[in-house]
């Protein structure tokens, strides 16, 4: 491994659907990031390394990094990541990047509309987890409201729906709506269309 990369051990995997899954990795104690940033993951393919940027789902307060993936069958990297299980290692760059972060320390009250589809929810989950902890500890007043709209074709593609709805019930500063464009594929769907 070179000085820009290291191997991160996968500690957990959860499949949400046949082509959607999350993994948690142990990044070691030196990996630092801000909610909304991404990490670059990679794997070897045909003798060379393939890398892609993935938004971090977890909060900086969590000891592990969580990622949410959608399998792209003809893709360069997700088919390789799809095969990985707990105990396997994934190549990761040592430094998080990205400026898609949320500012809550300003005096003015800025509200945020967070719009995403399926795996695009990842940085928003990181925001909400981080602000939820800050709010419980009195570090975030909740003056800035967050409104999350997450869309998908099928209801089972909402990997973080239950968690986000549970937080929304506990706080005055966060609301979420999940909407499916093909609700007829799940007779139990009671959400938005």
Predicted features by range, described:
Residues 117-123:
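Ser/Thr-glycine-rich phosphate-binding loops at phosphate-binding pockets of nucleotides
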Residues 96-107:
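A short, basic/flexible loop-to-alpha-helix module at the beginning of a structural domain
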């Amino acid at each position: 491994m070179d000085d820009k990369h290291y191997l991160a051990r996968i500690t957990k995997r959860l499949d949400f659907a046949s082509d959607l899954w999350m993994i948690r990795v142990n990044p070691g104690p030196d990996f630092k990031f801000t909610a909304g940033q991404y990490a670059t993951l990679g794997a070897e393919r045909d003798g060379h390394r393939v890398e892609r940027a993935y938004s971090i789902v977890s909060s900086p307060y969590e000891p592990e990094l969580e990622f949410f993936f959608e399998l792209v069958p003809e893709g360069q990297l997700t088919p390789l990541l799809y095969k990985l299980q707990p105990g396997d290692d994934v190549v990761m760059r040592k430094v998080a990047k990205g400026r898609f972060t949320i500012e809550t320390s300003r005096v003015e009250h800025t509200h945020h509309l967070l719009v995403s589809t399926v795996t695009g929810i990842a940085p928003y989950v990181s925001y909400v987890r981080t602000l939820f902890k800050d709010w419980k500890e009195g570090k975030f007043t909740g003056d800035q409201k967050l409104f999350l709209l997450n869309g998908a074709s099928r209801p089972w593609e909402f990997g973080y729906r239950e968690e986000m709805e549970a937080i929304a019930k506990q706080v005055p500063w966060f609301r979420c709506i999940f909407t499916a464009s093909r609700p007829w594929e799940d007779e139990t769907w009671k959400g938005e269309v």
